Curated annotation (Swiss-Prot):
Pfam families: PetL
Its biological purpose: Component of the cytochrome b6-f complex, which mediates electron transfer between photosystem II (PSII) and photosystem I (PSI), cyclic electron flow around PSI, and state transitions. PetL is important for photoautotrophic growth as well as for electron transfer efficiency and stability of the cytochrome b6-f complex.
Protein name per its UniProtKB record: Cytochrome b6-f complex subunit 6
Subcellular location: Plastid, Chloroplast thylakoid membrane
Disulphide-bridged cysteine pairs: none
TM region(s), chain numbering: 3-23
Top-level taxon of origin: Eukaryota
Annotated source species: Populus trichocarpa
Keywords: Chloroplast, Electron transport, Membrane, Photosynthesis, Plastid, Thylakoid, Transmembrane, Transmembrane helix, Transport
Family of this protein: Belongs to the PetL family.
Length: 31
């Protein structure tokens, strides 16, 4: 199932990027 693995990997990367952006915005708001 290469397609399922690729989809899961893409979802994981998207979630990581979203989490990093959210943390960055939170830090900017704190400052």
């Amino acid at each position: 199932m290469p397609t399922l693995t690729s989809y899961f990997g893409f979802l994981l990367v998207a979630l990581t990027i979203t989490l990093v952006l959210f943390i960055s915005l939170s830090k900017i708001r704190l400052i």
